[in-house]
């Protein structure tokens, strides 16, 4: 009986942890932006079309994760190409921490940093595969600071993402 009680307690503890965890993946890849449903008390998410054929739906993490505050200050950007969710990006600029790196390592797997280098000084990227998803963690310098980024894309929509990235690259090359 004690073993059963212990298992039941462990299961309830794990179930509670999943309820409290933040779920920013509120839509499936390939679904239209109209499928995004938020709490009625929240303001409408910001929808920004871009010159490359995409639309970015931007939602602050605070609107998605009421209980888990560890990623507050992060923007969640849903990229729609031809009204299909193609990429989910977590963008965290100029924070004095490495919370997206910690999140990525705990969720997708650990990767080694150069010995003796603090996490906040490291710049680079790391890629994981999880089922049909490609996950890339990026820490890079930006104008007046740095940013942490997690890009999640589906292999099923990689051709559309490659075309989109090619358009962005051409435009960036023309700006030099």
Residues of each region from the PLM?
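Mid-chain, structured segments of secreted extracytoplasmic proteins
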Residues: 61-103
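Cleavable N-terminal signal peptides
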Residues: 7-9, 19
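N-terminal signal peptide c-region/cleavage motif recognized by signal peptidases
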Residues: 14-17
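Sterically constrained small-residue positions within well-ordered secondary structures
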Residues: 12, 69, 79-81, 117-119, ...
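Residue-level detector of intrinsically disordered/flexible regions characterized by low predicted structural confidence
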Residues: 4, 57, 68-69
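Bacterial N-terminal signal peptides that target proteins for export
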Residues: 1-7
């Amino acid at each position: 009986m004690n073993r059963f009680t212990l298992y039941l307690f462990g299961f309830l503890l794990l179930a509670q942890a999943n309820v409290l965890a933040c779920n920013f993946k509120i839509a499936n890849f390939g679904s239209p932006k109209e499928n995004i449903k938020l709490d009625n008390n929240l303001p409408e998410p910001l929808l920004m079309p871009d010159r490359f054929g995409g639309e970015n739906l931007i939602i602050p993490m605070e609107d998605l994760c009421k209980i888990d505050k560890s990623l507050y200050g992060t923007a969640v950007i849903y990229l729609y190409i031809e009204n299909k969710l193609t990429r989910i990006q977590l963008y965290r600029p100029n924070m004095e921490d490495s919370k997206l790196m910690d999140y990525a390592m705990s969720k997708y797997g650990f990767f080694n940093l150069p010995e003796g280098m603090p996490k906040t000084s490291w710049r680079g990227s790391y890629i994981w595969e999880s089922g049909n998803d490609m996950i890339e963690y990026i820490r890079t310098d930006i104008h007046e600071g740095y940013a942490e980024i997690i890009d999640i894309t589906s292999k099923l929509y990689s051709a559309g993402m490659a075309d989109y990235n090619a358009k962005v690259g051409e435009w960036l090359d023309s700006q030099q």
